[in-house]
Amino acid sequence: MVPPSKKRKLPAATGPATKRSKNIPKPSSSKKKSGKESRSTVEAGALSWASVGEDFGGLEVIEGVDVVKDGNRVQFLVSGDKNKSNIIDPQQEVVDGDRPFEGFGDDAVEVGDIDSGEVGSDQAGAESKKPQGKNKGKNEPKEGQEKADQETNKKQKQKQNKNKLDGKNGAGNKQDEQLVKAAQGVQKSSTRGGNTFGALADGNDYKDQEDVDMAAWVSLNLSPQIISAIAKLKFMKPTKIQKRTIPEIVAGHDVIGKAQTGSGKTLAFGIPMVERWLEMQEQGVKRTGPMSLVLSPTRELAKQLGDHLKALCDGLPSAPYVCVVTGGLSILKQQRQLEKADIVIGTPGRLWEVLSGDRALQSKFAKIRFLVVDEADRLFKVGQFKEAEDIIGALDGKSPGDDAESEEESDEEDEDDEDAARQTLVFSATFDKDLQTKLAGKGKSSGNDDEKMAYLMKCLKFRGEPKFIDVNPVSQMAEGLREGLIECGAMEKDLYLYTVLILNPGRRTLVFTNSISAVRRLTPLLTNLNLTALPLHSQMAQKARHRSLERFTASRNSILIATDVAARGLDIKEVDQVLHYHVPRSADTYIHRSGRTARGESSGISVILCAPEEVLPTRRLASKVHAVRSAGVKREHFIQTLLIDRKAASRLKPRVDLAKKIADTILAKEKAHSDDTWLRNAADELGVEYDSDDLEEINAGGGKGGRGGGRKRKEQTAKQLTKAEMGALKAQLREELSRRVNLGVSERYITGGRVDVGALLREGQQGGMFLGNTDGLGFDL
């Protein structure tokens, strides 16, 4: 007998079946669902997606659809009874608000009611006029009525738009042109793979760009693309160095440019390089490697040069690829970037590390069109950057081991070589070799300009006589800079440094020292005094150096304590004052240090803390920096002696001594732990026993005399402070910092009439530190 599960059950014949309409789907028996239903493959765009809402970021969902992955393809399967409910009829009328975006057309933009989104409504209604083909049935009268209502509403809106356009004046036409420009900006951005929404945002800035007068840049024979990019940077007119050097560089001459700090030397060589790259793109010149090489003495300056050139290129429809090659970062990533780089900016050490082992890369760099040496006097200082000379030799096809005779022969051959198409551009604020001599020794004048530039001519290969452009031959200091000097003892510099910072609160300050150890000591000292102090020196990791610069730029009251690694080229906005904790070793260092403030048309101050043993170097510094300035200047002294309030300094001394003791103790403990770890590891490697107590006795017994004996005894004493003693010192310092410094106010008879109590209360609410009046630094304005 056949099992019951395999028997076929026939439907009961109750009567003749009614005739089914074509538009009514055939009802399927629930008992047939055990078999597979017929499913069809549908494209994702043809499905009727339903929007969840704006709260979910515009998420759309659909029901009754199976998703099947076939290899790399994704298919959407819809069952037969749900085809019509989940699939959008392509011939159905598309409403303007629901029609998908198909990109901008080539026709002119028709401006309508912007708030209601009716721009280009004629194109939106083009699809709705198509006749409906096979969609006929019971719902036909209802759909026809909806279509008639939509056409009526559309005609009314078009009539309203026409009335609005007829009533607009010239201002409306100008707005229309701006919208057209914005749409064109979107098309340009999309063609080059940029951010479309960023282009839409840029369309709102056309009015601001039209207000910028760029007539001063037009006379420099620059392309409209470059002028437009400069306009986006809001540079109204070129600086003196830019106005004189850009035409010479564009004409193909080698240039040596000298200008004061903060005068725009970066764009003076950056604009011609980008201009040349645009010309090569228009001419269809095939890329054979990097077009330009820029050498920088420090990592921070190299990064800044790259940021400035990238900002210039951001305003171009097509821009060169700028690559920064510095130490402290991944060398593999930099090697990959060099494969596609057009403009390379690097420091000599890392750049030579990349070039030295790659002959193919050296051959590509030998074909560069521009060689730019920024801060050339620092790069080619005798005995400083051996890698810079090796890089120049590699560009000329020489190996580092070539002797002098082979170099002379190659120089004679290169003079007859017509393929030497490389332009050499040299920029700095100081080319006088006399400024590089040490202030502590006796230096002789190096003579005229020809003798001063002779050392550069030996290092660099110019195609001929370079154009020497000096825009400020009289003064090498910025016009808005005021210079001052504070006389103090060698052991009182910490006190007077803190006094200057307190007398000038709310200023972004840059403190320069001559040693890394001073940076490591001053940073915790000022931090203990509740000041935002940040370190910067060459032994820090590169990411830590970037972090210090970013924090210094972000905070208005921050203090950056740095060595001369931050003296050249750094363009930090709104640096109010520069303090020289040590007198610089050379005059050119003082010029570049002071150039971190008073950049461009802004003002700033530069103050030297001068100890008695530094008086002679300070006099030589003043004579070298300001000797050429004529007597027609109004100021009697270029470096003014500041009569700082000694009473305020004496009242601040207790808190400075406490902070210094805490900082020295922490540094001594860290140093002892580091030395102990090193000696213990060395003893383990040698296989001998290490006894720290015996070593301490030896070190303590050798303190009778000799150099550094007193310092070692102080470190030994600071090392022995216990944790409880450190806590007591910190509590005492907190108590000192919580009180305001009294500068002569009678606390016992405060209502006697001689004290402005209201002013004291207001100063206390604003964070004032003193009780009484202070004269500041005493600059003669």
Curated annotation (Swiss-Prot):
ATP binds at residues 259-266. A motif (DEAD box) lies at residues 374-377. The Q motif is unique to and characteristic of the DEAD box family of RNA helicases and controls ATP binding and hydrolysis. Its main location: nucleus. GO terms for cellular component: nucleolus. The keyword Nuclease does not apply. Residues 246-449 form the Helicase ATP-binding domain. Belongs to the DEAD box helicase family. DDX24/MAK5 subfamily. Residues 104-116, 402-419 have a biased composition (Acidic residues). PANTHER family: RNA HELICASE. Keywords: ATP-binding, Helicase, Hydrolase, Nucleotide-binding, Nucleus, Ribosome biogenesis, RNA-binding, rRNA processing. It comes from the Eukaryota. A motif (Q motif) lies at residues 215-243. Residues 137-154 have a biased composition (Basic and acidic residues). Residues 494-643 form the Helicase C-terminal domain. Residues 1-10, 19-34 have a biased composition (Basic residues). ATP-binding RNA helicase involved in the biogenesis of 60S ribosomal subunits and is required for the normal formation of 25S and 5.8S rRNAs. InterPro entries: DEAD/DEAH_box_helicase_dom, Helicase_ATP-bd, Helicase_C-like, P-loop_NTPase, RNA-helicase_DEAD-box_CS, RNA_helicase_DEAD_Q_motif. Residues 1-47, 79-196, 394-419, 697-721 are annotated as: Disordered. It is found in: Nucleus, Nucleolus. One of its GO terms (molecular function) is ATP hydrolysis activity. This is ATP-dependent RNA helicase MAK5. The gene is MAK5. GO terms for biological process: rRNA processing.
